[in-house]
């Protein structure tokens, strides 16, 4: 696998602890405590999911930092206690607790924070603007980048895209799954989650589909917009940007293979 430490494109999976990966992605007999170190050598990013369900310890974040390569980047899911609420404007205390939990122990390896919303959450312009206003631009001296993963059709509006763009927050670009796609780039980086791996493909996706995803990632990184993503508004001219691409859900056992194949194609 070719690993380019200078690439602005980071590719990975969700989490690193998954029983079916043992003996498939992870070598048989690899100690569980060595799994992150192994995954970090094969991938260029991982989306931490455990933070969505509950607080992690500062020493855990510090250990994860130390167990991965220098150029590795973690995306981190924001806590559900902030996003799964009727009135988003009241999420302030949950957001503050999250950033006090030790997440900054990831140091320079802290990538975007993904705030994932329930599939039933509808777009309320005023309340969503109040939520975005609560998101800090920095914590403990680290610049913080935010992404929002909205999963209801009501968000497919120019008003939502403009709102996200005004706050410099990336809209997660979902693909190959059940959720609506909003392909508009609204921040200085792109965050995409692709969900189409299948059991019948050794690499999760057909070779042609992997090549297409590699080209989309390269287009985003150069400041462009792939011609086949679904936009709500008008594309804006942009400079080169970071790209975070995660292979999620689908037939999860194949996700590491798909991610590694993408890294190889991106170069």
Question: Positions of the model-derived regions?
Answer:
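Residues lining hydrophobic/aromatic ligand-binding pockets adjacent to catalytic sites
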Residues: 1-267
